[in-house]
């Protein structure tokens, strides 16, 4: 009879979890969107266990995530991505992820939330399945430059939506290749809103210490990880580091670092003590200045600018791209540098402007004969 007693205790605990977790999710929904969001389906404990084969290792999705363990599964006869929160994730963060994911699920450039299971602690999230789990394998496979530009434009489109579609501004705050997914059609989708920060209506910034906590946790998660083929992003906005203010420029700065990751700037200068992936090393030096006191006051854009001046565009951009796409990729690289603070032309005012310029670059890439006239406007 002990097994029956244990079963009843576990069922009672799961019922309590639903009540407690549901209260936190509701609170986040009210705070983020005044309770107005897409319906959130509640999957049962048994459905999740069956879909993941009791979270079997063979069902694990191959990806690195600071906050989640990701599993492949089948629910309602469709493939899904099931994200189980780690215990480093507090309840408020995961419930914020649920709330904001539900708000943006109708947009094509966000990972679509199908539902969640509140019987677990922390809750389990169920998303549409992304066949290409992260950008890491993509970057190491050297995709064409048109595809890279398209991915950047789609991610910029998602950030623009976060910044402008609601009465309050939402700052993603932890953009990196590990928070971006690709579906079966190669469409980029932004996910993971655990650290999403809300700027109150009528304000342009907010003070927040979430970013510092996230980067410390991320550093510990990635420590000793090699061969990822991507830089150790996100890149912290220097204005945030000096003032603690989170603004739309916080996302713009991280997005610029992501753009540089897409062109895979590579090592050309041993004297700078860079790793095999130059941009990863640059980001490491910027994110973790305590590792090397020589770089404490040396922002990322100074590193990149110095390397470009010394070696030139063709020496630092992925060799598969440098010969076939000179005009659009140079414009792409220039825009990335402007996003991270380089003074190259007019300053960027918002992600709306970044998205518009990426559309021009993408158009010029598809119609090479118009490259020079298109690039002159950027």
Swiss-Prot record:
<dbReference type="InterPro" id="IPR001245">
    <property type="entry name" value="Ser-Thr/Tyr_kinase_cat_dom"/>
</dbReference>
<dbReference type="InterPro" id="IPR045274">
    <property type="entry name" value="WAK-like"/>
</dbReference>
<protein>
    <recommendedName>
        <fullName>Non-functional pseudokinase ZRK6</fullName>
    </recommendedName>
</protein>
<dbReference type="GO" id="GO:0004672">
    <property type="term" value="F:protein kinase activity"/>
</dbReference>
<dbReference type="InterPro" id="IPR000719">
    <property type="entry name" value="Prot_kinase_dom"/>
</dbReference>
<dbReference type="GO" id="GO:0007166">
    <property type="term" value="P:cell surface receptor signaling pathway"/>
</dbReference>
<keyword id="KW-0067">ATP-binding</keyword>
<comment type="similarity">
    <text>Belongs to the protein kinase superfamily. Ser/Thr protein kinase family. ZRK subfamily.</text>
</comment>
<feature type="binding site">
    <location>
        <begin position="40"/>
        <end position="48"/>
    </location>
    <ligand>
        <name>ATP</name>
    </ligand>
</feature>
<feature type="domain" description="Protein kinase">
    <location>
        <begin position="34"/>
        <end position="378"/>
    </location>
</feature>
<dbReference type="GO" id="GO:0005524">
    <property type="term" value="F:ATP binding"/>
</dbReference>
<dbReference type="InterPro" id="IPR011009">
    <property type="entry name" value="Kinase-like_dom_sf"/>
</dbReference>
<keyword id="KW-0547">Nucleotide-binding</keyword>
<dbReference type="GO" id="GO:0009266">
    <property type="term" value="P:response to temperature stimulus"/>
</dbReference>
<dbReference type="Pfam" id="PF07714">
    <property type="entry name" value="PK_Tyr_Ser-Thr"/>
</dbReference>
<feature type="binding site">
    <location>
        <position position="83"/>
    </location>
    <ligand>
        <name>ATP</name>
    </ligand>
</feature>
<comment type="subunit">
    <text>Interacts with RPP13L4/ZAR1.</text>
</comment>
